[in-house]
């Protein structure tokens, strides 16, 4: 992945053109990224990070079902699943930890009935240009690479569109983005969450 490659280059002191490894890693690290979102007053679903089935069960008690589970630091929606009870959660967590050992698992409260959207933007570190905002056709939770979307969005009101624009600008600038950025959103009850 780009993150792994940039980490190696950073370790050897090789500068890259574009967003720094530190910013890429911050965007991928759920704990650090949620701090950035809090500082910018940007909503996101409640979440937890687990390394064992027991930890996942403790987190599930705090989040309430349904819960979206996925491995940390993987691409393509690998291992992502929405679970609706403790038995499903425990089975999926055990399966993931066998398939991808030594990986942390992300557990998000799943915003049932939410609409998914995403924004693509380009930033020079000071200015953000939103290239496009897409609205997904499938329910929120289907991996974006496996779903269809419309450009421009067909059913997002002015309030929602403004939140997407504001969130995209704040995140791109807070991460010191230099280059492209893609941000995914879940919209429920006119509130735009980062997912």
Predicted regions and their residues:
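N-terminal beta-alpha lobe that positions the nucleotide/phosphoryl donor
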Residues: 1-183, 187-195
């Amino acid at each position: 992945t780009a993150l792994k490659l940039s980490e190696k280059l950073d370790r050897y002191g090789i500068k890259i053109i574009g967003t720094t490894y530190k910013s890429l890693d911050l965007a991928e690290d759920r704990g650090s990224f949620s701090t950035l979102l809090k500082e910018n007053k940007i909503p996101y679903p409640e979440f937890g990070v687990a390394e064992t089935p027991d930890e996942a069960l403790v987190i599930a008690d705090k989040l309430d079902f349904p819960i979206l589970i996925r491995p940390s630091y993987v691409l393509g929606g690998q291992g992502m699943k929405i679970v609706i009870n403790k038995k499903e959660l425990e089975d999926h967590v055990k399966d993931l930890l066998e398939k991808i050992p030594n990986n942390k698992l992300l557990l998000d409260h799943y915003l049932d009935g939410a609409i998914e959207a995403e924004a693509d933007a380009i930033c020079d570190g000071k200015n953000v240009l939103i290239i496009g905002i897409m609205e997904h056709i499938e329910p929120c939770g289907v991996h974006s690479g496996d779903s269809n979307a419309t450009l421009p969005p067909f059913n997002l009101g002015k309030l929602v569109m403004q939140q997407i624009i504001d969130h995209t600008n704040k995140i791109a600038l807070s991460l010191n983005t230099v280059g492209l950025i893609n941000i995914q959103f879940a919209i429920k009850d006119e509130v735009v969450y980062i997912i």
